[in-house]
A protein has these predicted regions:
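Positively charged, low-complexity terminal tracts
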Residues: 1-131
Length: 131
């Protein structure tokens, strides 16, 4: 499961805390994004399991879809009355490949992976609080 998502506003950083199952789910999602560049799709196989400390209660991956290239990668956050309600992260194809390589290097135990902005953005990863 994804154990926590922490945002560090001062560094514009998004940190995923994952166990082996969460790592595998995230890896499958990103590999699918790399293969299906022209399609928006849902990810019903990813289980909710977010930590309260990062402002999430029960959340899930909603969509990953292509977007228009931008000058640089953006990480934007939406805030509800109880904290963060959504996170969007745009990735270039190069950043997507780098993200996949980082996940592949992670072990099967609990670990944290920090993501920072990079140049360009043909992909957007959107996470949102479940209703």
């Amino acid at each position: 499961m994804i154990l926590a998502i922490d945002t560090h506003r001062e560094r514009d950083e998004l940190a995923f805390t994952l166990d082996g199952e969460g790592r595998d789910c995230l890896l499958r999602m990103l590999e699918r994004a790399r293969r299906e560049r022209d399609h928006e799709f849902d990810l019903p196989d990813v289980e909710p399991g977010w930590s309260r400390r990062s402002g999430y209660d029960q959340c899930e991956f909603i969509n990953i879809f292509p977007c228009m290239p931008e000058d640089r990668c953006t990480i934007s956050r939406g805030y509800g009355k109880d904290g963060i309600s959504s996170v969007e992260m745009a990735l270039t194809a190069t950043s997507l490949d780098a993200f996949i390589r980082m996940l592949e290097r992670m072990g099967s135990g609990e670990d944290t992976l920090a993501i920072r902005p990079a140049a360009g953005s043909p992909f957007t990863l959107r996470l949102a609080a479940a209703e």
